[in-house]
Curated annotation (Swiss-Prot):
Additional note from the record: Contains 2 motifs that are conserved in esterases, but it is unlikely that this protein belongs to the catalytically active pectin esterases.
Function, in words: May act as a bridging protein that binds pectin and other cell wall polysaccharides. Probably involved in maintaining esterification of pectins. May be involved in the specific O-acetylation of cell wall polymers.
Motif DCXHWCLPGXXDXWN motif, residue numbers: 375-389
Keywords attached to this entry: Membrane, Signal-anchor, Transmembrane, Transmembrane helix
Entry similarity comment: Belongs to the PC-esterase family. TBL subfamily.
InterPro entries, sorted: TBL, TBL_C, TBL_N
Name of this protein: Protein trichome birefringence-like 45
Motif segment (GDS motif): 131-133
Subcellular location: Membrane
Membrane-topology descriptor: Single-pass type II membrane protein
One cellular component (GO) term of this entry: membrane
A single GO molecular function term of this UniProt record: O-acetyltransferase activity
Superkingdom of the organism of origin: Eukaryota
Length: 398
């Protein structure tokens, strides 16, 4: 009888301890892989998020001035890393205050990026950005952040199309960018460039499946018209269309991508993120309705000449709000398979962060006409994509 009572007590003790275990914090799922050292991260001694993790929204906050920024200088990235179109300081941008702002969530603190820690956690792994030139913008940012905070590492870079890879040899880490602006396939059919809404190319699929961490993005290319349109016809359901409602096309394309993720990605083994739409600042009507206390330069016809973020924590409108809703809906339908990096609002506040005319891609005559030539789509490096990567770092490792 005593033995039975002892076993009963032991069972109840174990049951109580098992059921009272604390849940994983927000943005921290078990990370596993076919590599033996890619295991669930132990709880850190430094508490980054509050006790009530559900109250921590990394993407709701405000921009605060921080004199310790930027995280790096462009010369620390290595030769040929930053695209000339993103290297604003090198190509003549006269102001630098836009580099002195840090994103501060309301209810939690974002860990400062630590390149050595990142490489230790990602040893023997491949991190792959997949998407358009905004994905490239973020890829180059992460390379710079790693190179500046772990300066003694041996590296090698391969620039190819569609796949470019930055290798950190000491840790056997690969940070890659796969160019796929629509995510779905685009190919010649009967002599016409065709956007195939129901297909992802075999080459893309094979490349993506080699990654341990995937971060996808798409958006801007779906709304391009005229000479900027990247296709001549669309194909879906075995039928061809000269055009269709772009949001319908985006929804179909993302449905194809979603099916691919659910079919080929083993969630416990591979982490998948999706970057929400990165806003543009070409239309001054989006910000002229703001209060007179706004810090924005009035009268501008684009992002040119803007040197400070929007004051406040909200942005009145955006030309990409409908695209964002489509992306949000698709990702939410996938539940735990994909984590949404909802950077749209925090980025919309950074009208000051674009290259404008300070781009190595513009000749002098184009720079003399900023209202027509300014790049208000991409972002300066150093700059806003560094914040995207700090949030990515927090979501991935904490």
């Amino acid at each position: 009888m005593a033995a039975v009572q002892c076993l009963t007590f032991l069972f109840l003790f174990l049951l109580q301890n098992a059921t009272s275990a604390s849940p994983l914090p927000l943005f921290r799922r078990p990370i596993q892989s076919n590599h033996s050292n890619f295991v669930k991260h132990p709880r850190r001694s430094q508490v980054v998020f509050p006790v009530n993790h559900s109250s921590c929204d990394l993407f709701a906050g405000e921009w605060v001035r921080d004199e310790t920024y930027p995280l790096y200088r462009s010369k620390e990235c290595g030769r040929g890393i930053i695209d000339p179109g993103f290297d604003c300081q090198t190509y003549g941008r006269p102001d630098s205050d836009y580099l002195k702002f840090r994103w501060k969530p309301f209810n939690c603190n974002v860990p400062r990026f630590n390149g050595v820690k990142f490489l230790q956690e990602m040893r023997d792994k491949t991190i792959m950005f997949v998407g358009d030139s905004l994905g490239r913008n973020q890829w180059e940012s992460l390379i710079c952040m790693i190179s500046s905070s772990a300066p003694s590492i041996n590296t090698h870079i391969i620039h190819e199309d569609p796949l470019s890879t930055f290798k950190i040899l000491d840790y056997n880490v690969k940070v890659s960018f796969y160019r796929a602006p629509y995510l779905v396939d685009i190919d010649k059919i009967n002599g016409k460039t065709t956007l195939k809404l129901d297909e992802i190319s075999v080459d893309a699929s094979n490349a993506w499946r080699t990654a341990d961490v995937l971060l996808f993005n798409t958006g801007h290319w779906w709304s391009h018209t005229g000479s900027l349109r990247g296709w001549e016809q669309m194909e879906t359901g075995g039928r061809y269309y000269g055009d269709m409602d772009r949001l319908v096309a985006l929804r179909k394309g993302l449905g194809t991508w979603s099916s691919w993720v659910l079919r080929y990605i083993n969630s416990p083994l591979t982490r998948v993120f999706f970057l929400s739409v990165s806003p543009t600042h070409y239309n001054p009507n989006e910000w002229t309705s703001r209060s007179k206390t706004s810090t924005i330069t009035q009268g501008g016809k684009s992002c040119y000449g803007q040197t400070t973020p929007f004051s406040g924590t909200t942005y009145p409108t955006s030309s990409y709000v409908n695209q964002k809703k489509v992306i949000d809906d698709v990702v939410k339908e996938m539940k735990s398979h994909v984590s949404l990096m909802d950077i749209t609002m925090l980025s919309a506040l950074r009208v000051d962060g674009h290259p404008s005319i300070y781009s190595g891609d513009l000749n002098p005559s184009l720079k003399r006409n900023p209202d027509r030539s300014s790049d208000c789509s991409h972002w300066c490096l150093p700059g806003l994509p560094d914040t995207w990567n700090q949030l990515f770092y927090a979501a991935l490792l904490y």
